[in-house]
Amino acid sequence: MESEIASEFLPFCRIYKDGRVERLIGTDTIPASLDPTYDVVSKDVIYSPENNLSVRLFLPHKSTKLTAGNKLPLLIYIHGGAWIIESPFSPLYHNYLTEVVKSANCLAVSVQYRRAPEDPVPAAYEDVWSAIQWIFAHSNGSGPVDWINKHADFGKVFLGGDSAGGNISHHMAMKAGKEKKLDLKIKGIAVVHPAFWGTDPVDEYDVQDKETRSGIAEIWEKIASPNSVNGTDDPLFNVNGSGSDFSGLGCDKVLVAVAGKDVFVRQGLAYAAKLEKCEWEGTVEVVEEEGEDHVFHLQNPKSDKALKFLKKFVEFIIG
């Protein structure tokens, strides 16, 4: 007999009374491949045996035939999915990172992290931080992964992520800036359609609709981060809150991308404005695509606007 449903958090998942979690979207996977058909090869490597977590690496095929002196920009990518769905192995992210690596001629490391509800926030942040340290352990050329040892330019390290991954990217750069003794030098972060929120709208143009605001709050408070003391004003979610300070952000430049129809658009713009006003000495670039919705560049990657953003993202990495 099928288990009884305890709760549903549409469109993401369904939780049964026996504790089983059924993800309703974002579950498809595609294998890594050393086939150079698309000019990019990929492979999976475990970085956290204790949690059975891997990274998926993407490398331009031509680089596999070159010497160790062929150093490439390194993109550490953090997928989105409301802290609940998706992975580096989904077609959505595999195909996107393939295009980014092909266009930017960079090495990309796409990070798997534990997801809610089985492992609620802050597990995802802890895992990504662990992965970043694992990646930087290759900076002296003696790490466990040859691709990183041979091809990563640790003077050109970028973090990038969309939605929840954009949120995590910001917090990782903040942590890198704070943990100076670790010497994790990050050149820039790309914060794409970041999932930032709060109890109150950031301005008069932010989402005012109570049903929408309560729906996002429910996802955060009941499934993504049920242990948050302050609900949607948790500093991990409400980065634009009055108590936040970006002056210690550990990177030189930030690309903030927002979409006009996205519920997070005003939060993203407020984030960029706060960066520009604080004592952080880096540079901020804002890319706003009117008439588009959340992660449109992933959902419709061949559209003119998606290709336009891909070009901007690539310029950010190689510029």
Curated annotation (Swiss-Prot):
Organism name: Arabidopsis thaliana
This protein's name: Probable carboxylesterase 5
Membership in a protein family: Belongs to the 'GDXG' lipolytic enzyme family.
Motif, Involved in the stabilization of the negatively charged intermediate by the formation of the oxyanion hole: chain positions: 79-81
Tissue-level expression: Expressed in roots, leaves, stems, flowers and siliques.
Catalytic activities: a carboxylic ester + H2O = an alcohol + a carboxylate + H(+)
Alphabetical keyword list: Acetylation, Hydrolase, Serine esterase
Its EC number(s): 3.1.1.1
Species classification: Eukaryota, Viridiplantae, Streptophyta, Embryophyta, Tracheophyta
Database matches in InterPro entries: AB_hydrolase_3, AB_hydrolase_fold, Carboxylest/Gibb_receptor
